[in-house]
């Protein structure tokens, strides 16, 4: 417990609250995961069917940086005061999270400035692909797998290739198609401006 408190900067009371919250959320989502806080030790118990991506998703869902990235996938831009209000944080806190996030994004030659992505479109998509490949929960994967348009895309690609895709290849295709679809949708007005010129 001491090492976790030092690493996170949480008080023991805050850590206890987070452990309770995570356990409740795991139970609500049907995830076989429990964090035990016993004396001065933390212990993680996971079921055999629990996947790493489900654990990462559980921990990240309410993280501010994660929510910023998800917001920008589905929206072209944000105004700081509106996003801060939506995330229920101060603008100063949002600014600190954006600064920290930009340090991470610099590895991809990307940044978020004035509420918008800055960087090459292919890098933005590649970043989202690498990121969501690790953090999408099994439920999210399954939800996208069941969409008729995704099933059709898989069938079409298998027909063109003359081979069946593995489950991993199908998941990669579904993720890439989802990211591309969202990026095209949020950038539609930019493409319209280019077409008009």
Feature locations, PLM:
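A cross-family "folded-core" feature that marks the main globular domain of proteins
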Residues: 1-197
């Amino acid at each position: 417990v001491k090492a976790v408190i030092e690493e996170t900067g949480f008080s023991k009371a805050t850590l206890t609250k987070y452990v309770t919250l995570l356990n409740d959320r795991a139970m609500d989502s049907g995830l076989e995961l429990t964090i035990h806080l016993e004396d001065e030790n933390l212990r993680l118990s996971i079921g055999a069917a629990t996947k790493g991506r489900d654990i990462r998703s559980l921990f990240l869902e309410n993280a501010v940086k994660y929510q910023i990235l998800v917001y920008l996938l589905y929206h072209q831009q944000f105004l700081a005061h509106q996003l801060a209000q939506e995330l229920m944080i101060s603008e100063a806190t949002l600014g600190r999270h954006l600064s920290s996030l930009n340090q991470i994004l610099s590895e991809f030659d990307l940044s978020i400035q004035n509420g918008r992505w800055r960087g090459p479109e292919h890098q933005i998509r590649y970043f989202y692909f690498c990121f969501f490949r690790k953090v999408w929960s099994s439920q999210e994967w399954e939800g996208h797998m069941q969409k008729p348009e995704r099933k059709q895309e898989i069938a079409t690609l298998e027909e063109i290739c003359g081979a069946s895709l593995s489950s991993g290849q199908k998941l990669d295709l579904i993720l890439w198609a989802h990211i591309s679809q969202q990026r095209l949708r949020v950038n539609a007005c930019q493409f319209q401006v280019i077409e008009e010129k």
